[in-house]
Amino acid sequence: IERCTPRILRLAPRFTPWQAPPDMDELTQIQAYTQLWTIKEALYKIADQPSVRFYEDLQIPHFQALAPCQQALITCPEGDKAYEVQSFFWEGYIWSMVGEE
C-alpha cells in the first residue's frame, strides 16, 4: 500500500522508463507513477530472487495509467513469466496485487 505524494515524480526515472503524456495533470501523474511503483513492488516480492533488477526485469509493457487491470512480466535468464495485476485506489492510496496468468 502506497500513499500518493509528489515525491514519486522525482523517483520515477529511477524505476520506470514510462513517461506520462505531456497533457496529463500533476495529480494524475502522481497517481500513475505510484501505481507503477506498487506494481513493481508486488512483482519484486513475487519474484523472490535477489538478482531481479527493479528497473530492467520488472516490466509493465503496455501500462495504462490508472487502469485497474494490467499485464506484467518478470524477465530472467530462465524465461519470462507473465502476470496479471490488479490495482486498487482509495482516498490517496494505491496498492497492487499480482497473480500468475
Regions found by a protein language model. Name each.
Residues 2-101:
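Core catalytic alpha/beta fold that binds nucleotide/phospho-ligands
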